[in-house]
Each structure stands twice: as structure tokens, then as C-alpha cells.
Design a protein with these regions (language model features):
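Enzymes that bind and transform nitrogen-containing heteroaromatic metabolites
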Residues: 1-180
Length: 180
């Protein structure tokens, strides 16, 4: 059975992107040569994202995740995905099936519309969150208000120059996890 991961960066005040879905603030952050991205990608078979995230990622990354299955969730059944394929069914149902059917891990890239439902459904097994020392003040938050109170375990902290990565996992046995 696959695991579902979130791996992504936020501003210090919790935003995934600015008000225009832009990520330039992240690309302007000095990270040095200790990036964890390549090692993380080696653990992933399928990359999942929403349409807006797909369009933004293609502006910065070409080719987009070579050697990985790329799934783009969109309500537009005519949306042309250059690398990967479009899916218009419910993301939570789709990911539950995919998690059971494949052995390779699944990376949920974003965006917020997709992530919110996946977080509420408690499908993410591990989190890698990079925090950039930038205050955006507005934009799309990683965590919106909702009903998803969950206790996680800290696995590791990695410093990449100006970026700090926190790696968490959901406890294997929720009965043994500390209460909130």
C-alpha cells in the first residue's frame, strides 16, 4: 500500500502562494546546496496537484517531474495536460483507491482547494513543510479553517540556508498518539 505525502514550502505566516498564485518569494529564498527535493522525489511514484498548481509549476519546472505519473485534478474535463493526465472525479475517493492499488508513494503538491479536502479526510501520512523567512501578509494558506484536528510526530528538522524543513508523520497507531 502506498503512502500519501505532502512536500511543500510556506511563508513564515503560513501562505503557499501570494494573492496571484505566485511563488517568486520562494524562488528568491536562498537555499544553498542541501536541498532535500531529489531524495524526496526518489521515494515517490505519483505526483498529484490541482490545475492552478499545475499551470504555475510548468512556468518554473520543465520537464515536470520526469519518470513520475502526474495527476492533475480539474473540474474542466477539456483541460489539456501536457505532462500527465487530468482527473475530474472526487480527489478524496480517487486518492483512497490509488493508495490501495499501488505500492509507490503519492506526493500531493497542492493547491489549497485540493489539499483542504485531503487534509479533512486525514489522508496525508507524512508532511515535509519548508518554511521561508518571508511574511506575505496575504495569499493562499496551507491550512484553512476546517475540522481536521490531528496530532503529528516530528521526525526531523533540516536547515537549508534560509529555508527550514520540518518533517512530520501521522502516528501509525492513532490510539497511542498524544491527545490534543
Amino acid at each position: 500500500m502506498a503512502k500519501i505525502f505532502f512536500y511543500g514550502a510556506i511563508s513564515l505566516d503560513g501562505y503557499l502562494s501570494d494573492v496571484n498564485d505566485g511563488l517568486q518569494w520562494l524562488f528568491d529564498t536562498e537555499v544553498g546546496d542541501k536541498l532535500t527535493t531529489d531524495a524526496f522525489l526518489d521515494t515517490v511514484e505519483t505526483v498529484v496537484m490541482g490545475r492552478i498548481t499545475y499551470e504555475e509549476a510548468r512556468k518554473y519546472v520543465q520537464p515536470l517531474y520526469p519518470g513520475k505519473d502526474v495527476v492533475v485534478f480539474t473540474h474542466n474535463t477539456n483541460f489539456d495536460v501536457q505532462e500527465g493526465f487530468a482527473v475530474s472525479e472526487d480527489p478524496v475517493d480517487y486518492l483512497r483507491k490509488l493508495k490501495e492499488q499501488q505500492s509507490g508513494n503519492i506526493w500531493v503538491v497542492g493547491g489549497m482547494n485540493l489539499l483542504k479536502n485531503i487534509i479533512v479526510a486525514d489522508l496525508i501520512d507524512e508532511w515535509w513543510i519548508q518554511i521561508a523567512p518571508v511574511l506575505l501578509g496575504n495569499g493562499k494558506r496551507l491550512f484553512e479553517q476546517s475540522d481536521y484536528q490531528t496530532r503529528l510526530e516530528l521526525i526531523d528538522i533540516t536547515q537549508m540556508k534560509q529555508l527550514t524543513e520540518l518533517h512530520f508523520r501521522r502516528p501509525e497507531n492513532k490510539k497511542d498518539s498524544p491527545s490534543l
